[in-house]
Amino acid sequence: MSASFINEPENFVPFLDLLKQLIRVPSVTGAEHSFLLYLKRELEEIGIKTQYYDGLLVAQGNNPTKGILSAHIDRHGVICTGPNEFQFAAFLAKNRSDLRGNSLSEQTYQLIAKRYINQQVLAYEPWSGSYLGIGQIKDAFMCEEINNLIFEIEGLSHLQPGTPIAFSDKLKRKDDLISAQLDNVISAAIIIYLYQNGFQGTAFFTAQEEAGKSWRYVYEWFKKNNISTNELLVLDTSPYDTRDEADKQLVVLRNKDVNAKFKSPILKQLKEFCHKNDIDFSCKDTFIEEKNKIREENGLPILSLGSTELGRIVMESNGTIQGTTLQIPTTGYHTVEETASIKSVKAILHILSSLYIDKCLKK
């Protein structure tokens, strides 16, 4: 791998500054409008054209086919649903129509409920992003009657139904690790950073991925513009149970998910680039399949291969839209302590800038 990316290039500090800045702007699932407008301004200030649709911000440089990237920008949070009543935003009944029960997040959200206790939260106005108050989660539990997580929050009893509540967050750095609610603001930061450094392709910033809806926004854009591609590259984080598991690779690829196989020249290109540049990678579907063999031998239920935004797009388009995923391995999934290695982030930046920017990032 390029030594300059292992040994922290000068331009990595601006990336961290950008990530810190984006993390501070809330973007709860179903209430992403103010964050999308924030991204729109950041892009237009550097001369990138944008179009804002319902649930989708499309950015295009001077060479729109030189890379087609996508990243969801919603983050897990809470919605006020009544007098002193708060529910997990992504799994509200009105948001569940596209959830099939086969995503990794749906299988794990019950297990992580207690991680949110004592978490500071902030309420905001969903259109302007204006601050509406600070609170603290006192309890979180599964309510079987409504099939959702219920939160007891101190300090926000004045809120009206429909008000989004984000987990109060800031980027933390310790040694070679960074932590925050990284899923998936870190991918948005990567794309903005690439544009700042010469990327001229197309990027999609999608809403409501955590509610299983983001694929619709991208798919509809391709359909109404009568465009097909086999080079859509979706950026995201990929959860692992332990740091040891996560550190076995710098980047995570996929051959398939539960919905579809990924048949794209980009997948082969990514694998070849990683081999050539000594970047350790793994394929998440292979990792899960190997884990399931052990689970079956021990009489444990098998894990889902996971449902991705790209898999739904490939399936619904009958393969007319194809691509692959490029993910950062993390631990602490769906919390404000989600952790990634700096080497992983640098590897992703190195890969994307080498593939899509004619003149690589300044050293």
What kind of feature is each model-predicted range?
Residues 1-363:
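N-terminal hydrophobic/helix-forming segments and targeting peptides
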